């Protein structure tokens, strides 16, 4: 993904980006050290705690489908073409999942208690593809629970309505597509590589828009993940426009310096007195 973007840059700009990406200090500094530490800790936490605590998404799906069957009974048989059904399921799940990401992200900025958690992510003063993993463990659990709920509800409804016509391949495939799409865009959203989408930013969130979201002075919006229509409806959409110098981190200098705290301290503490963005 980064390679494709670099090919579109002018030669001079491309040299600057390559120089930045190959600079050891870009990847290894006080800010990125916290990225790597939280990435490892959250991975272990999710495996050892969140999965056993919340359960798998497929189990949640079966619980929802059975609850609908017990309450409403068996629906009238609906036979759809498998391809059409797969497209419909993928589209609806994508919309619900993307909106839930937007709503939770906006809440993380608007609700002071949640901002205390989310400010850990925004304390990064250097953005790299690993910054996406710079998340307070409690926030990581909240987002994991969000994914569990949205997947279980949407898939449970489809299983109840269409039963065996919705195959396990469709269900797993949607998760795989979502994972690949997020991985492809995340490495540009959390970087210093400026990529705007022009007029398409009214509909899709560009990496440049998310970089504005991380800047200290320029933006208090762009909460969307893939679709920017939610920001447009909420009045929080900010277009990238021309490239400009950006400063990343938190408004309060002492909060910016928290990125140099030991990872364990950051894992247990929150940025309580930082300003809600």
Question: Where do the protein language model's features map onto the residues?
Answer:
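Residue-identity detector for glutamine
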Residues: 15, 57, 209-211, 253, ...
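A membrane-cytosol interface segment of integral membrane proteins
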Residues: 170, 244-277
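Membrane-embedded catalytic scaffold of the fatty acid hydroxylase/desaturase
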Residues: 41-53, 60-65, 76-247
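Residues that form generic nucleotide/phosphate-binding pockets
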Residues: 39, 233, 266-270
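Specific transmembrane helices
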Residues: 1-71, 89-101
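Coil-to-alpha-helix initiation sites in intrinsically disordered, low-complexity, charged segments
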Residues: 16-20, 27, 31, 78, ...
């Amino acid at each position: 993904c980064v390679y494709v973007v670099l090919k579109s840059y002018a030669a001079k700009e491309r040299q600057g980006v390559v120089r930045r990406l190959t600079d050891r200090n870009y990847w290894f500094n006080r800010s990125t050290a916290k990225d790597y530490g939280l990435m490892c800790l959250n991975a272990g936490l999710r495996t050892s705690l969140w999965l056993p605590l919340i359960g798998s998404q497929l189990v949640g799906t079966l619980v929802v489908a059975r609850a609908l069957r017990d309450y409403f009974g068996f629906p009238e048989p609906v036979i759809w073409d498998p391809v059409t059904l797969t497209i419909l399921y993928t589209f609806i799940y994508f919309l619900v999942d993307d909106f839930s990401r937007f709503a939770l992200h906006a809440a993380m900025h608007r609700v002071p208690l949640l901002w205390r958690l989310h400010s850990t992510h925004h304390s990064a003063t250097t953005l790299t593809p690993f910054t996406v993993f710079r998340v307070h463990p409690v926030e990581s659990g909240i987002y994991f629970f969000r994914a569990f709920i949205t997947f279980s509800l949407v898939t449970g409804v489809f299983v109840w309505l269409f039963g065996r016509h919705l195959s396990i391949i469709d269900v797993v495939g949607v998760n795989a597509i979502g994972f690949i799409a997020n991985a492809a865009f995340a490495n540009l959203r959390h970087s210093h590589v400026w990529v705007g989408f022009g007029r398409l930013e009214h509909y899709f969130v560009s990496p440049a828009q998310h970089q504005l979201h991380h800047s200290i002075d320029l933006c208090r919006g762009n909460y969307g993940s893939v679709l920017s229509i939610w920001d447009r409806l909420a009045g929080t959409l900010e277009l990238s426009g021309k490239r400009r110098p950006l400063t990343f981190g938190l408004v309060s200098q002492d909060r910016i310096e928290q990125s140099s705290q030991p990872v364990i301290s950051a894992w247990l503490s929150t940025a309580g007195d930082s300003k809600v963005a």
